[in-house]
Amino acid sequence: MAVKTYQAGVTEYRQSYWQPDYAPLDTDLLACFKITPQPGVDREEAAVAVAAESSCGTWTTVWTDLLTDLDYYKGRAYRLEDVPGDDTCFYAFIAYPIDLFEEGSVVNVFTSLVGNVFGFKAVRALRLEDLRFPIAYVKTCGGPPNGIQVERDKLNKYGRLLLGCTIKPKLGLSAKNYGRACYEALRGGLDFTKDDENINSQPFMRWRDRFDFVMEAVQKAEQETGERKGHYLNVTAPTPEEMYKRAEHAKEIGAPIIMHDYLAGGLCANAGLANWCRNNGMLPHVHRAMHAVLDRNPHHGIHFRVLTKILRLSGGDHLHTGTVVGKLEGDRASTLGWIDLLRESFVPEDRSRGIFFDQDWGSMPGAFAVASGGIHVWHMPALVAIFGDDSVLQFGGGTLGHPWGNAAGAHANRVALEACVQARNEGRQIEKEGREILTAAAQHSPELKIAMETWKEIKFEFETMDKLAIANK
């Protein structure tokens, strides 16, 4: 074995981090970055700069390089691809040895892959498009505490999508009035009601008062309907200690499910709360507040499919995924891609849906996809077709905005859902025949008829900012 010697100075990154003949190992963590280099910086130079800075490189040679095996620990840029329709940027594929990352810590993965490298001067913009987590790493993560089947068993609800409602106005209600709004929606036919992500413990409604009034409403609705009900009690808090205090109280008063903002609250807090839920038999509903800051710019940030994978590893039984048809951003093909990444046990590479790598989840359970944001009864046929059964449809204004009140709005949504599920099961093309299906159901439901009349002109037709960059969509 040759003796390694130290030579001070600066070595070009490409001498160590560009390896186009590298065949990624099954145990490698693979990343796809979209890189927009600075003028005058060629593609290879930009790619290897990202590979070095996100693994074990630094700007100059250091003598401590001799104390380790950099050839093993380094990230390797192994392939570059054009971005269809955009010659200002390119895709760089980088392989990282699994030993660079702490087992079961998505926090540590993000510290390296979306850390200082995103401020690197060699690149004008940088976006993490996708990650392939090797099964050896997946098995070190906790994942969803319950999973889809366990949640259905807890709720005794099968064969259809679940229905929910975010209570509005999202800020300003007293705890007692808030509980009343929950009760009306639950007795009308919803499975869940939900705290808005903005609701924590403000002066107009402290968290303990809200929890107590809401659980009184849940239990009363259960007694009247004979169905299992729930409310997503938001335990997101200023500190982890306060978060666990709120979670413990939710458990004490019989709540089956709690809620956490996993990006605003932090990945470390989310993983800890998921472990607590696993140990205490609770369901964690996860909201994605803050995601658009990270994922909406098509050239810089983190794609939501990556945030979806991170959540599944970190732990959550529900995740908001967008609606395609509602008021929030979301391309249909991309949305279907990250919904599969959330729910399926194996998802193959599929560039038509923006999936750059095969992803094997092993035995890790999946989670419910949650559609929320500007949806109403007219969207029901499309939502059932797009999302499938293992989903939760959250109608906020589409429930509480009904002219006859919350219970009528909930009833209208339940009738519309059951009509669409029945039509689908009969083999009908529910997206094409949606108007006919809903109109027929409304003949027996005045609540649905009024809802259809109220929102018949409401559409959210805006161009998607983050479009799939594929050659043949």
Swiss-Prot record:
The modification N6-carboxylysine is found at residue 194. The active site is at residues 168, 287. GO terms for molecular function: magnesium ion binding; monooxygenase activity; ribulose-bisphosphate carboxylase activity. The record marks 327 as: Transition state stabilizer. GO terms for biological process: reductive pentose-phosphate cycle. InterPro entries: RuBisCO, RuBisCo_large_chain_AS, RuBisCO_lsu_C, RuBisCO_lsu_C_sf, RuBisCO_lsu_fd_N, RuBisCO_lsu_N_sf, RuBisCO_lsuI. Signal peptide: none annotated. It is an enzyme of class 4 (lyase). Substrate binds at residues 116, 166, 170, 288, 320, 372. PROSITE patterns: RUBISCO_LARGE. It comes from the Bacteria. Binds 1 Mg(2+) ion per subunit. Keywords: Calvin cycle, Carbon dioxide fixation, Lyase, Magnesium, Metal-binding, Monooxygenase, Oxidoreductase. It catalyses: 2 (2R)-3-phosphoglycerate + 2 H(+) = D-ribulose 1,5-bisphosphate + CO2 + H2O; D-ribulose 1,5-bisphosphate + O2 = 2-phosphoglycolate + (2R)-3-phosphoglycerate + 2 H(+). SUPFAM superfamilies: RuBisCo, C-terminal domain (SSF51649), RuBisCO, large subunit, small (N-terminal) domain (SSF54966). Its EC number is 4.1.1.39. Heterohexadecamer of 8 large chains and 8 small chains. The basic functional RuBisCO is composed of a large chain homodimer in a 'head-to-tail' conformation. In form I RuBisCO this homodimer is arranged in a barrel-like tetramer with the small subunits forming a tetrameric 'cap' on each end of the 'barrel'. Belongs to the RuBisCO large chain family. Type I subfamily. This is Ribulose bisphosphate carboxylase large chain.
